[in-house]
Amino acid sequence: MNINIGLSDVLLISPMIALFLASLLPITMKVLRGNREQHALITLGQALMGIVAAVVLLVVFGGSDKTAFNNGLIFDGVTQWMGIIALAGAGAAMVMMYENPSTTGKQFSELIFLAMSSAVGMLILVSAVDLLMVFIGLEMMSLALYLMIAMSHEEKLSKEAALKYFILGSFASAIFLYGVAFIFGSTGGTNILSFMDNAAELVQTSRLFLFGVTFVILGFCFKVSIAPFHAWTPDVYQGAPTPHTAFMATAVKTVSFAAFLRIIATKSLTGSDQLFDILQWMAVITMIVGNAAAIMQNNFKRMIAYSSVAHSGYLMVGLITAGVSDNGAFGASGVIFYLLAYGLMTIGAFAIAAMLEKSENHIVNIDDLAGFAKQRPMLALCLTVFLLSLAGIPPTLGFFGKFYMFNAAIGEGLLWLAIWGMLNSVIGVYYYLRPIVVMYMKEGNAEIAGHSLNATTVTAVVMALAIVLMGFVSGPIFSAVEKSLL
């Protein structure tokens, strides 16, 4: 197969090139300085410059529906929106890494290099329409992430989290590749665009193709924490340094759902009632399991981890809607809008958690928030905004995210699925209100860590303001997302 690479291909992948070049700056400077770290703020600045450049290039070249590298990558509305959301989440997480005791030190340049390399993999994953390119992006993102988690100084929990994530991630990748092999055997190719128009028919006529699609979907179910493939999530989220957890919960989750969306958008669900029903029940079970487990947690990070599982269930409602809708843009835009809201509120929640960690091994329990409202009223208000938005309370952005997604499901006749989503959202209110009650109603001496946390504080405040202000203009934002997908 001949692949002709022209100037247009290079321009389309320029966001990835910008990220890659920016990732080299910190480690190059370290080598030139005789293996001595430059000031961490300079390293962070170099990374953020690369992210800003990549976002600008995505705005300029993304959304054009052009393909590159023999139709292996596409730069459409999904690529543009999901890429920007993921890069914004990655950038915010890097700001948290700059001030966190478990991630700063003699290896900060290497850590930023790995984070930027993972971000390059994210952009490949979010734009890939060839299953082999999806795999390349997935592995580039994941392998860098495994090393990032394991690099957390000498904390044993991080080493354990990295090992669990690596073993289970490798298993999921094997399942995904197994599915790709089946699809290649039944269609003679691995490009999603080549079988998108007749995927529903292939599911009915080719058992091999059905198996392939099923295995690919199962591989993604692990990556996005769909029950029963969610068990790794609380352990890894709790064991990883908090900035890394924020990185995984926002940027990694966003691009994984983007790739998952491209598979579901082939309309293969309409060709198999069994696969359609199984995914619906998996979405419901994921919501129930995530919320039920979150209620029983006292560890703040573990509670957010289980709530992340529940949110994956909500997002599955949007994916399924996009998979059966004649106007896939409506369901897909609901997923993108929800991921935008989810990214803001999750980064914010983990930013507050990071500020409460007094040391590398400190565990933040919900009861530790007692008195936080008196000690730090502004940060307590920010955390309240994040938790209310996660619960879906109006007029926060989280409420409108659920509204648009469930409304799309009802419009496609998936009323029962939307009802399950709304019921579980009500259940979630209980454990999201618990930290708020502890902060404002209980006496205590909750205080943030002694080291400088100015950048993390700014991150939390900006996220809280964005959640509130964007909630008032959610309609135009949703319309802009939907228009870019048409």
From Swiss-Prot:
It is found in: Cell inner membrane. The chain crosses the membrane at residues 5-25, 41-61, 77-97, 118-138, 165-185, 209-229, 245-265, 275-295, 304-324, 335-355, 380-400, 413-433, 458-478. It is a multi-pass membrane protein. The keyword Chloroplast does not apply. InterPro entries: NADH-Q_OxRdtase_suN/2 (IPR010096), ND/Mrp_TM (IPR001750). GO terms for cellular component: plasma membrane. It catalyses: a quinone + NADH + 5 H(+)(in) = a quinol + NAD(+) + 4 H(+)(out). Its EC number is 7.1.1.-. NDH-1 shuttles electrons from NADH, via FMN and iron-sulfur (Fe-S) centers, to quinones in the respiratory chain. The immediate electron acceptor for the enzyme in this species is believed to be ubiquinone. Couples the redox reaction to proton translocation (for every two electrons transferred, four hydrogen ions are translocated across the cytoplasmic membrane), and thus conserves the redox energy in a proton gradient. NDH-1 is composed of 14 different subunits. Subunits NuoA, H, J, K, L, M, N constitute the membrane sector of the complex. Belongs to the complex I subunit 2 family. This is NADH-quinone oxidoreductase subunit N. The lineage of its organism: Bacteria, Pseudomonadati, Bdellovibrionota, Bdellovibrionia, Bdellovibrionales.
